[in-house]
Amino acid sequence: MMWYGQIGFIQSEEDLDRSALLMTLAMNGDAFKQWESIYVVTSFFAGTSDDLTYYEYLPAIEAAYGGVPEVSALIGNTDGWNTFRSLTAAMDPPAINSIPTMDDGDSDTKTTDANKGFRFMGQRFTIDEAIFQQLVYDNVQADASGNQRMLPDTLDVAAALGSDTAYSILEQQGDTGYAGYTENMETLRTNISQASDTLWTSSLYSNWLHTLTPLLEEKGEGYPSFMRSSQWAKKDLETFAGRYAELKHDTVLYAKQVMAEMGGGELPQWDDRGYVEPEVEVWTRFSNLATKTAEGLKSYGLLSEEDETNLNRLAQMADQFKTMSEKELSNTLLTDDEYDLIRNYGGNLEHF
């Protein structure tokens, strides 16, 4: 899948654009149905393609040739070919640059030329990678020492999603010293804060980011004093970064990981009652995410009975943690059953 997403038929190279036309024609019909059955499900998980695909190229072919032509009809049809070339040249380039390019003084043009083109199963657009794109060279320029910002930082995402704590750390690290960084960050924060719900519900990946964003919000009146401290804000930022790292991992690697068994002897008798981080909105969104995941997979006919049961259990657990969070915020003592759920949380997760 990675190979299909990265190997492109670059529009600026005529032979490759011709290959893209032929591949699109080859995909038409039954082959398209098979391709789409893979594409729509992976889009449900990770989002739609950032690159040009069959969806963009087939309409261009129809417009240039007056319909879907036979391959034999392409030979000698110079007018159709020239029209097709002009239509593909006018298509939007990808929002995210995934191709290393040399800086020769005309980097904008070169990057666009090296990236824009047809891909069989294009890599997916994600909000966080779009954030990164705007905060590295050459969208930001050198700092006072002449250094370029060649790599992004996880804190870029947190700051763009609204975390003042993350932005403060970036300032301390010197990241805001790169020319254009502050301006680009402000633009990103404004655009994201004004984004519609459609952006966050477009895929499970986007929905996960939306689920985590309450961790980045400043806790005001109504929260316990310890949750309104700068230390708690940093702890929440670390929680966000940890789950974000797992989210990135989940979208590129699907190998099973070895786990330790729960148990192994009697525990000493101590007061081991735990607590739930009182993030009511996070638990609410997590419950909704589990429910929507089950509904989406079921609609594609890809949800086994066991997986449906597990997703329903996840949603139920999130609802229970939401209830506990509300109790903690109102200084209401948890029940023994609720303390038991916290105590055995890891063991419950182990069996999903």
Language-model segments: which ranges?
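Long, non-catalytic protein-protein interaction scaffolds
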Residues: 2-352
